[in-house]
Amino acid sequence: MATWSNLNLQNSSSPLMEQLIFFHDHTLMILLMITVLVAYIMSMLFFNLYTNRFLLEGQTIEIIWTILPAITLIFIALPSLRLLYLLDESMDPLITMKTIGHQWYWSYEYMDFKNIIEFDSYMSALDKLSSFRLLDVDNRTILPMNTQIRTLVTAADVIHSWTVSALGVKTDATPGRLNQINFMINRPGLFYGQCSEICGANHSFMPIVIESVNLKNFINWIKNYSS
Protein backbone atom coordinates (compact mmCIF):
# COMPACT_ATOMS: atom_id res chain seq x y z
CA MET A 1 0.00 0.00 0.00
CA ALA A 2 1.03 3.63 -0.32
CA THR A 3 3.03 4.98 2.62
CA TRP A 4 3.80 8.43 3.93
CA SER A 5 6.33 10.45 1.85
CA ASN A 6 6.97 7.52 -0.49
CA LEU A 7 8.09 8.76 -3.92
CA ASN A 8 8.51 5.30 -5.45
CA LEU A 9 6.00 2.91 -6.95
CA GLN A 10 4.36 0.38 -4.66
CA ASN A 11 6.04 -3.00 -4.30
CA SER A 12 5.01 -5.35 -7.07
CA SER A 13 2.63 -8.17 -6.14
CA SER A 14 1.86 -9.49 -9.62
CA PRO A 15 3.76 -10.22 -12.84
CA LEU A 16 1.89 -7.37 -14.57
CA MET A 17 3.05 -4.83 -12.01
CA GLU A 18 6.63 -6.08 -12.39
CA GLN A 19 6.48 -5.43 -16.13
CA LEU A 20 4.97 -1.97 -15.56
CA ILE A 21 7.80 -1.08 -13.17
CA PHE A 22 10.42 -2.35 -15.64
CA PHE A 23 8.90 -0.25 -18.43
CA HIS A 24 8.75 2.80 -16.15
CA ASP A 25 12.44 2.47 -15.27
CA HIS A 26 13.40 1.81 -18.90
CA THR A 27 11.57 4.91 -20.15
CA LEU A 28 12.80 7.07 -17.28
CA MET A 29 16.42 6.15 -18.05
CA ILE A 30 15.98 7.17 -21.70
CA LEU A 31 14.41 10.49 -20.66
CA LEU A 32 17.23 11.10 -18.19
CA MET A 33 19.89 10.57 -20.87
CA ILE A 34 18.06 12.91 -23.27
CA THR A 35 17.75 15.57 -20.56
CA VAL A 36 21.46 15.38 -19.67
CA LEU A 37 22.51 15.52 -23.34
CA VAL A 38 20.30 18.53 -24.13
CA ALA A 39 21.43 20.35 -20.97
CA TYR A 40 25.09 19.72 -21.87
CA ILE A 41 24.65 21.01 -25.45
CA MET A 42 22.75 24.10 -24.27
CA SER A 43 25.41 24.92 -21.67
CA MET A 44 28.19 24.51 -24.25
CA LEU A 45 26.39 26.82 -26.68
CA PHE A 46 25.78 29.36 -23.94
CA PHE A 47 29.37 29.54 -22.70
CA ASN A 48 31.13 29.03 -26.05
CA LEU A 49 32.24 32.43 -27.42
CA TYR A 50 33.51 31.14 -30.77
CA THR A 51 31.44 31.62 -33.93
CA ASN A 52 31.79 29.65 -37.17
CA ARG A 53 31.09 32.15 -39.96
CA PHE A 54 31.11 29.45 -42.65
CA LEU A 55 28.54 27.08 -41.10
CA LEU A 56 25.50 28.02 -43.17
CA GLU A 57 24.05 24.50 -43.38
CA GLY A 58 24.87 21.03 -42.10
CA GLN A 59 23.29 18.10 -43.93
CA THR A 60 25.02 15.54 -41.74
CA ILE A 61 23.88 16.97 -38.41
CA GLU A 62 20.32 17.38 -39.74
CA ILE A 63 20.24 13.71 -40.71
CA ILE A 64 21.60 12.73 -37.29
CA TRP A 65 19.07 14.73 -35.27
CA THR A 66 16.27 13.30 -37.41
CA ILE A 67 17.34 9.65 -37.13
CA LEU A 68 18.27 9.64 -33.43
CA PRO A 69 14.80 10.69 -32.15
CA ALA A 70 13.24 8.05 -34.42
CA ILE A 71 15.49 5.36 -32.95
CA THR A 72 14.71 6.60 -29.44
CA LEU A 73 10.97 6.36 -30.10
CA ILE A 74 11.43 2.80 -31.35
CA PHE A 75 13.22 1.85 -28.11
CA ILE A 76 10.22 3.20 -26.18
CA ALA A 77 7.47 1.93 -28.49
CA LEU A 78 8.52 -1.73 -28.70
CA PRO A 79 8.41 -2.43 -24.92
CA SER A 80 5.21 -0.38 -24.70
CA LEU A 81 3.46 -2.46 -27.38
CA ARG A 82 4.63 -5.66 -25.72
CA LEU A 83 3.24 -4.49 -22.38
CA LEU A 84 -0.09 -3.51 -23.95
CA TYR A 85 -0.34 -7.04 -25.35
CA LEU A 86 0.41 -8.58 -21.94
CA LEU A 87 -2.20 -6.40 -20.22
CA ASP A 88 -4.93 -7.60 -22.59
CA GLU A 89 -3.77 -11.20 -22.88
CA SER A 90 -6.41 -13.59 -21.56
CA MET A 91 -4.91 -16.65 -19.92
CA ASP A 92 -7.02 -19.65 -18.91
CA PRO A 93 -8.54 -18.26 -15.69
CA LEU A 94 -9.21 -20.58 -12.78
CA ILE A 95 -11.54 -18.10 -11.07
CA THR A 96 -13.88 -15.47 -12.46
CA MET A 97 -14.99 -12.67 -10.15
CA LYS A 98 -17.55 -10.00 -10.99
CA THR A 99 -17.09 -6.54 -9.50
CA ILE A 100 -19.95 -4.02 -9.48
CA GLY A 101 -19.45 -0.38 -8.54
CA HIS A 102 -22.17 1.50 -6.67
CA GLN A 103 -22.46 4.92 -5.07
CA TRP A 104 -20.47 4.42 -2.88
CA TYR A 105 -19.45 0.81 -2.29
CA TRP A 106 -18.41 -2.30 -4.23
CA SER A 107 -20.27 -5.58 -4.76
CA TYR A 108 -18.51 -8.85 -5.57
CA GLU A 109 -19.77 -12.11 -7.07
CA TYR A 110 -17.98 -15.46 -7.38
CA MET A 111 -19.76 -17.43 -10.10
CA ASP A 112 -17.58 -20.55 -10.51
CA PHE A 113 -18.99 -22.51 -7.59
CA LYS A 114 -22.15 -24.50 -6.88
CA ASN A 115 -23.68 -21.61 -4.97
CA ILE A 116 -23.01 -18.09 -6.22
CA ILE A 117 -21.17 -16.14 -3.54
CA GLU A 118 -22.02 -12.45 -3.44
CA PHE A 119 -21.47 -9.72 -0.88
CA ASP A 120 -21.13 -5.96 -0.54
CA SER A 121 -17.95 -4.24 0.61
CA TYR A 122 -18.35 -0.93 2.49
CA MET A 123 -15.68 1.25 4.03
CA SER A 124 -15.12 0.51 7.72
CA ALA A 125 -16.42 3.03 10.22
CA LEU A 126 -13.96 5.74 11.20
CA ASP A 127 -14.28 4.92 14.92
CA LYS A 128 -12.41 1.63 14.36
CA LEU A 129 -8.94 2.91 15.12
CA SER A 130 -7.30 -0.52 14.64
CA SER A 131 -7.70 -0.29 10.86
CA PHE A 132 -6.30 2.02 8.21
CA ARG A 133 -8.32 5.20 7.92
CA LEU A 134 -10.40 5.39 4.71
CA LEU A 135 -8.83 2.17 3.38
CA ASP A 136 -10.26 -0.79 5.32
CA VAL A 137 -13.59 -2.44 4.54
CA ASP A 138 -16.08 -4.61 6.39
CA ASN A 139 -15.85 -7.48 3.85
CA ARG A 140 -12.52 -8.16 2.20
CA THR A 141 -12.22 -9.72 -1.23
CA ILE A 142 -10.55 -13.11 -0.75
CA LEU A 143 -8.51 -14.42 -3.68
CA PRO A 144 -5.99 -17.28 -4.01
CA MET A 145 -2.38 -16.49 -4.82
CA ASN A 146 -0.47 -18.01 -7.75
CA THR A 147 -3.77 -18.45 -9.58
CA GLN A 148 -4.90 -16.85 -12.82
CA ILE A 149 -7.90 -14.63 -12.01
CA ARG A 150 -10.33 -12.92 -14.36
CA THR A 151 -12.30 -9.95 -13.08
CA LEU A 152 -15.37 -8.62 -14.85
CA VAL A 153 -15.99 -5.00 -13.88
CA THR A 154 -19.20 -3.01 -14.32
CA ALA A 155 -21.26 -0.39 -12.49
CA ALA A 156 -24.88 0.02 -11.43
CA ASP A 157 -25.19 3.82 -11.53
CA VAL A 158 -22.30 6.05 -12.67
CA ILE A 159 -18.77 5.42 -13.96
CA HIS A 160 -16.33 4.10 -11.35
CA SER A 161 -12.81 2.69 -11.68
CA TRP A 162 -11.63 -0.47 -9.90
CA THR A 163 -7.94 0.07 -9.11
CA VAL A 164 -5.38 -1.88 -7.07
CA SER A 165 -1.96 -0.32 -7.63
CA ALA A 166 0.18 -3.13 -6.18
CA LEU A 167 -1.35 -5.57 -8.67
CA GLY A 168 -1.06 -3.20 -11.63
CA VAL A 169 -4.80 -3.31 -12.40
CA LYS A 170 -7.07 -0.36 -13.22
CA THR A 171 -10.36 -0.89 -15.04
CA ASP A 172 -13.27 1.44 -15.64
CA ALA A 173 -16.62 0.29 -14.25
CA THR A 174 -19.17 1.52 -16.78
CA PRO A 175 -22.95 1.02 -16.47
CA GLY A 176 -24.28 -1.40 -19.08
CA ARG A 177 -20.83 -2.64 -20.06
CA LEU A 178 -18.51 -5.41 -18.85
CA ASN A 179 -14.78 -4.70 -18.82
CA GLN A 180 -12.33 -7.52 -18.25
CA ILE A 181 -8.96 -7.61 -16.50
CA ASN A 182 -6.70 -10.62 -15.90
CA PHE A 183 -4.06 -10.83 -13.19
CA MET A 184 -2.26 -13.18 -10.84
CA ILE A 185 -1.16 -12.45 -7.28
CA ASN A 186 2.26 -13.91 -6.50
CA ARG A 187 2.39 -13.48 -2.72
CA PRO A 188 0.02 -13.51 0.26
CA GLY A 189 -1.03 -10.30 1.97
CA LEU A 190 -3.46 -7.40 1.98
CA PHE A 191 -3.63 -5.10 -1.04
CA TYR A 192 -5.45 -1.79 -0.90
CA GLY A 193 -7.03 0.20 -3.69
CA GLN A 194 -9.60 2.91 -4.26
CA CYS A 195 -12.06 4.10 -6.85
CA SER A 196 -10.05 6.12 -9.38
CA GLU A 197 -12.90 7.84 -11.20
CA ILE A 198 -14.71 10.79 -9.61
CA CYS A 199 -18.19 9.39 -9.02
CA GLY A 200 -19.90 11.77 -6.64
CA ALA A 201 -19.77 13.25 -3.16
CA ASN A 202 -18.39 10.12 -1.44
CA HIS A 203 -15.95 9.13 -4.18
CA SER A 204 -13.10 9.03 -1.65
CA PHE A 205 -14.95 6.61 0.62
CA MET A 206 -15.23 3.43 -1.45
CA PRO A 207 -11.94 1.57 -0.88
CA ILE A 208 -10.93 -1.85 -2.17
CA VAL A 209 -9.20 -4.49 -0.05
CA ILE A 210 -7.97 -7.76 -1.54
CA GLU A 211 -6.70 -10.48 0.77
CA SER A 212 -4.45 -12.99 -0.94
CA VAL A 213 -4.34 -16.45 0.67
CA ASN A 214 -3.14 -19.90 -0.36
CA LEU A 215 -5.50 -22.17 -2.27
CA LYS A 216 -6.35 -24.35 0.74
CA ASN A 217 -7.46 -21.39 2.84
CA PHE A 218 -9.42 -20.02 -0.11
CA ILE A 219 -11.33 -23.30 -0.51
CA ASN A 220 -12.08 -23.32 3.23
CA TRP A 221 -13.37 -19.75 2.98
CA ILE A 222 -15.62 -20.74 0.07
CA LYS A 223 -17.02 -23.69 2.05
CA ASN A 224 -17.64 -21.61 5.17
CA TYR A 225 -19.26 -18.78 3.20
CA SER A 226 -21.48 -21.18 1.24
CA SER A 227 -22.69 -22.88 4.39
From Swiss-Prot:
PROSITE patterns on file: COX2 (PS00078), COX2_CUA (PS50857), COX2_TM (PS50999)
A molecular function GO annotation: copper ion binding
The protein's required cofactors: Cu cation
Mitochondrial matrix side: 49-62
One Gene Ontology term, aspect cellular component: mitochondrial inner membrane
Topology within the bilayer: Multi-pass membrane protein
This protein's record includes keyword rRNA processing: no
Pfam families documented for this protein: COX2, COX2_TM
Sequence positions that bind Cu cation A2: 195, 197, 199, 203
Cofactor note: Binds a dinuclear copper A center per subunit.
UniProt keyword list: Copper, Electron transport, Magnesium, Membrane, Metal-binding, Mitochondrion, Mitochondrion inner membrane, Respiratory chain, Translocase, Transmembrane, Transmembrane helix, Transport
GO terms for biological process, alphabetical: ATP synthesis coupled electron transport
Annotated InterPro entries: CcO_II (IPR045187), CcO_II-like_C (IPR002429), CcO_II_C (IPR034210), Copper_CuA (IPR001505), Cupredoxin (IPR008972), Cyt_c_oxidase_su2_TM_dom (IPR011759), Cyt_c_oxidase_su2_TM_sf (IPR036257)
Primary location: mitochondrion
Top-level division of the source organism's lineage: Eukaryota
The protein's Enzyme Commission number: 7.1.1.9
Binding site for Cu cation A1: 160, 195, 199, 206
Residue ranges, Mitochondrial intermembrane side: 1-26, 83-227
Entry's transmembrane regions: 27-48, 63-82
Keyword Repeat: no
Similarity field: Belongs to the cytochrome c oxidase subunit 2 family.
PANTHER family given in the database record: CYTOCHROME C OXIDASE SUBUNIT 2, CYTOCHROME C OXIDASE, SUBUNIT II
Name of the featured protein: Cytochrome c oxidase subunit 2
